[in-house]
């Protein structure tokens, strides 16, 4: 849904790296090299970014009206 701010395993800050990561990967760059450039070294943090599925636009249709 929404990218977590911190890694679930080690607590490292990863939320600020999502936008540059997804932008560069969608432009055709290798995800591994992008993560290296962003300074994401731990495999637990890399997993958080690589395996995230952004489904917030699909879920928002099911919210209750206020």
Swiss-Prot record:
<dbReference type="GO" id="GO:0008270">
    <property type="term" value="F:zinc ion binding"/>
</dbReference>
<dbReference type="InterPro" id="IPR020789">
    <property type="entry name" value="RNA_pol_suN_Zn-BS"/>
</dbReference>
<comment type="function">
    <text>DNA-dependent RNA polymerase (RNAP) catalyzes the transcription of DNA into RNA using the four ribonucleoside triphosphates as substrates.</text>
</comment>
<feature type="binding site">
    <location>
        <position position="10"/>
    </location>
    <ligand>
        <name>Zn(2+)</name>
    </ligand>
</feature>
<dbReference type="GO" id="GO:0003899">
    <property type="term" value="F:DNA-directed RNA polymerase activity"/>
</dbReference>
<dbReference type="GO" id="GO:0005737">
    <property type="term" value="C:cytoplasm"/>
</dbReference>
<feature type="binding site">
    <location>
        <position position="45"/>
    </location>
    <ligand>
        <name>Zn(2+)</name>
    </ligand>
</feature>
<comment type="subunit">
    <text>Part of the RNA polymerase complex.</text>
</comment>
<keyword id="KW-0240">DNA-directed RNA polymerase</keyword>
<keyword id="KW-0804">Transcription</keyword>
<keyword id="KW-0808">Transferase</keyword>
<keyword id="KW-0548">Nucleotidyltransferase</keyword>
<dbReference type="GO" id="GO:0000428">
    <property type="term" value="C:DNA-directed RNA polymerase complex"/>
</dbReference>
<comment type="similarity">
    <text>Belongs to the archaeal Rpo10/eukaryotic RPB10 RNA polymerase subunit family.</text>
</comment>
<keyword id="KW-0479">Metal-binding</keyword>
<protein>
    <recommendedName>
        <fullName>DNA-directed RNA polymerase subunit Rpo10</fullName>
        <ecNumber>2.7.7.6</ecNumber>
    </recommendedName>
</protein>
<dbReference type="InterPro" id="IPR023580">
    <property type="entry name" value="RNA_pol_su_RPB10"/>
</dbReference>
<dbReference type="GO" id="GO:0003677">
    <property type="term" value="F:DNA binding"/>
</dbReference>
<keyword id="KW-0963">Cytoplasm</keyword>
<dbReference type="GO" id="GO:0006351">
    <property type="term" value="P:DNA-templated transcription"/>
</dbReference>
<dbReference type="InterPro" id="IPR000268">
    <property type="entry name" value="RPABC5/Rpb10"/>
</dbReference>
<feature type="binding site">
    <location>
        <position position="7"/>
    </location>
    <ligand>
        <name>Zn(2+)</name>
    </ligand>
</feature>
<feature type="binding site">
    <location>
        <position position="44"/>
    </location>
    <ligand>
        <name>Zn(2+)</name>
    </ligand>
</feature>
<dbReference type="Pfam" id="PF01194">
    <property type="entry name" value="RNA_pol_N"/>
</dbReference>
<keyword id="KW-0862">Zinc</keyword>
């Amino acid at each position: 849904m929404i990218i977590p701010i911190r890694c679930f395993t080690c607590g490292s800050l990863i939320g600020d790296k999502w936008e540059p990561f997804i932008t560069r990967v969608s432009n055709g760059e290798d995800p591994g090299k992008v993560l290296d450039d962003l300074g994401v070294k731990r495999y637990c943090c890399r997993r958080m970014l690589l395996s995230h599925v952004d489904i917030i636009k699909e879920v928002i249709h099911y919210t209750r009206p206020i």
